[in-house]
């Protein structure tokens, strides 16, 4: 089993959260994820969040750069209690993993060379994932210079790629593709 958000395709096969997401895109259905930071949204705020969530939202991403242990899990449980949208974890580190989510964006910060965020956090997460029934989506994370230092750059000590260096951005993206990454996340 690949997790709770499994659907069946026309041939009777199970679709993972990633396959369902891609199938919806190929059908021309727009996908819109709302990112909720557990440091800025408490479980008590979730009913109001769900009330004012844009109707176009198809997913909820939960995660942040610096989140205290347990907060992500609490927020995911509250969101699932008050809504029906798939919840995917967008983790800042391995402490933000929860078995209650529908999927985990298994991030590797490939725009920099900090081994802690290239493979270190992923190694820590792998130990937890062995005991969970949580679908993972390998995701390359690229920080692109947007003119101001982001929380991710500050926390990870990673410099963003220059926005005008399209060759470097393309090369990093293609390297991720050749390593089998299923999704690319660009942040500026």
Predicted feature locations:
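N-terminal amphipathic alpha-helix/helix-capping segment at the start of soluble metabolic enzymes
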Residues: 2-36, 126-138, 145
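Alpha/beta enzyme core
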Residues: 31, 38-85, 91-188
